[in-house]
From Swiss-Prot:
InterPro entries given in the database record: 4-PPantetheinyl_Trfase_dom, 4-PPantetheinyl_Trfase_dom_sf, ACPS, Ppantetheine-prot_Trfase_dom
A biological process from GO: fatty acid biosynthetic process
Keyword entries, A-Z: Cytoplasm, Fatty acid biosynthesis, Fatty acid metabolism, Lipid biosynthesis, Lipid metabolism, Magnesium, Metal-binding, Transferase
Catalytic activity line of the entry: apo-[ACP] + CoA = holo-[ACP] + adenosine 3',5'-bisphosphate + H(+)
Record: residues binding Mg(2+): 9, 60
Subcellular location: Cytoplasm
Protein name: Holo-[acyl-carrier-protein] synthase
One cellular-component annotation, GO: cytoplasm
Originating organism: Buchnera aphidicola subsp. Baizongia pistaciae (strain Bp)
């Protein structure tokens, strides 16, 4: 297996808190979350700020691993963060993200998230 793409992102949780405080939280949520994520948001076990911060960070990392960032038709909502029964994070690729991933001939994806009081960090790796 060889690495096809790597993306990493670190995010200040205070940045997300400021967005929410400035009454932009709902608009921001609708911009970065998929329909599935919007539906689970009210029932999330994490606090609202960390929920958004983790998703924003992992989607930024994934867009970097795809080699484009959020452009060329790729939207934040084309990526969904999920967790398996053990809590291990994984991504679902929808619409444009799915097309881009297939064009890279990606066979395996790896996701890791870490969050502390002030920061969230995400890394995404694609392999053939």
């Amino acid at each position: 297996m060889s690495i096809l793409g790597v993306g990493i992102d670190i995010l200040s949780i205070l940045r997300i808190k400021r967005i929410i405080k400035n009454k932009l939280g709902t608009k921001f949520s609708q911009k970065i979350l998929s329909n599935y994520e919007l539906n689970i948001l009210p029932n999330c076990k994490q606090n609202y700020t960390k929920f958004l911060a983790n998703r924003f960070s992992v989607k930024e990392a994934a867009s970097k691993a795809l080699g484009t960032g959020i452009r060329n038709g790729l939207k934040f909502s084309d990526l969904e963060l999920h967790h398996d029964k053990n809590g291990k994070p994984y991504l679902k690729f929808l619409k444009q993200a799915k097309k881009m991933l297939q064009a890279m001939n990606t066979k395996s994806t790896h996701v890791s998230l870490s969050d502390e009081k002030l920061y969230v960090c995400a890394i995404v790796i694609f392999e053939d």
